[in-house]
Every structure is written in C-alpha cells, then in structure tokens.
C-alpha cells in the first residue's frame, strides 16, 4: 500500500493473504518482531504491523477504488485509441480469452521506444511529466552482484526503452489527450 499505488496508505504499508493456517501463524509472528508473545521471539522478525492510522486511511480510500480504477481505464482507453506514433510500443490490453477471469487495473501505463531519452525530453518540453520506473535492472543492483555476469539482453533492452506516461484518477481526459498529442508529435531526431 505504498502511497503511489492504486490503493495507497499515507506511508508504507502492506498486506499478505493466504489460506494456509500454518503460514498465517508464522507471518503474524514475523510482522511482530518474530513473536507471538512479547519478548518471546521465535523468528528473526521485523516491525511490520499496519497501524490504526494507515488502516483508517486505507478503509476510506477503499470506498473510492472502483471509481478510481474506472477512471484509470478511461485514460488508458484514450491512450490506446489515440497514440498512433509508430516509434512507440504500447502495452497490450488484456486478451479477450482472459477477460472473463481478469481485469487490468492499470497502476502504470508503460510504453516502449528505442528513443526513450529523446521522447522523454520531447514530452517534458510539451508539459508532460514522465517517469522511468526501476531504472537499474535487478541483475545490475549491488545486492545481486553475484548475477552481474549474466547476459540478459531482453531485460537490458526493455530497461533502456520503458517510459511511464501520466496515469492517475485525478488526470482529466483533456490532459490525457494532451499526452496523446505530445506522443504523436514526437519525431525521432527532432531533439
């Protein structure tokens, strides 16, 4: 429930669901310093309890989640229908055969282009804010130096191409069409 997520708290928060009762007991201890009883640690745990303030905020925000998700889908529809630039690769909508079982909630709208940095500058010059989420591939993170020798060409290609367009329940359709217009006016080598 990171604040920037579709259902976000005021600060970091999270939840785990399971139907495994044994796992429930372990997880409850792990979130409470590894303990079921005060000062009786049976695991190396952490303080990961959801405090009352975060729970209250999430409870209120949950009431608006469906409407906000519908708004995100409206914006995505504008993007999918409007962006026609052949230099941009758009995300695919949920496949028809999967729609019976799944719906996309569109946390992010991530496009790809071989000219990402140029596009980002062009969009910025046109008043469109973008983000590069997760700018360093996992296998190149310091914590994973044991993987640094791996050859992951698809990961690295995608890493160099991804760009997140604005998407959120407060974005107006007019603003979404402005994003579309800016994307469509991008020309390779124009910057």
Identify the meaning behind each predicted range:
Residues 19-191:
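PLP-dependent aminotransferase class I/II
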Residues 7-11, 102-105:
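Short glycine-enriched loop/turn motifs at secondary-structure junctions
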Residues 3-9, 15-17, 164:
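Active-site phosphate-binding strand-loop segment of PLP-dependent enzymes
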Residues 1-9, 37-42:
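Conserved active-site segment immediately N-terminal to the catalytic lysine
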């Amino acid at each position: 429930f990171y604040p920037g997520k579709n259902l976000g708290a005021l600060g970091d928060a999270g939840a785990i669901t399971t139907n495994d009762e044994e796992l429930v007991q372990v997880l409850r201890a792990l979130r409470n310093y590894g303990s079921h009883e005060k000062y009786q640690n049976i695991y190396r745990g952490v303080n990961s309890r959801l405090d009352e303030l975060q729970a209250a905020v999430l409870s209120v925000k949950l009431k608006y989640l469906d409407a906000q998700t519908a708004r995100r889908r409206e914006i995505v529809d504008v993007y999918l229908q409007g962006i026609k630039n052949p230099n941009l690769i758009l995300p695919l909508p949920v496949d028809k055969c999967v729609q019976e079982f799944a719906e996309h909630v569109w946390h992010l709208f991530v496009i790809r282009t071989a000219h990402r940095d140029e596009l980002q500058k062009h969009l910025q010059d046109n008043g469109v804010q973008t983000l590069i989420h997760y700018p360093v591939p996992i296998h190149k993170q310091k914590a994973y130096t044991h993987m640094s020798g791996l050859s992951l060409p698809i990961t690295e290609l995608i890493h160099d191409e991804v760009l997140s367009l604005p998407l959120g329940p407060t974005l107006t359709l007019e603003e979404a069409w402005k994003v579309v217009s800016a994307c469509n006016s991008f020309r390779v080598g124009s910057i």
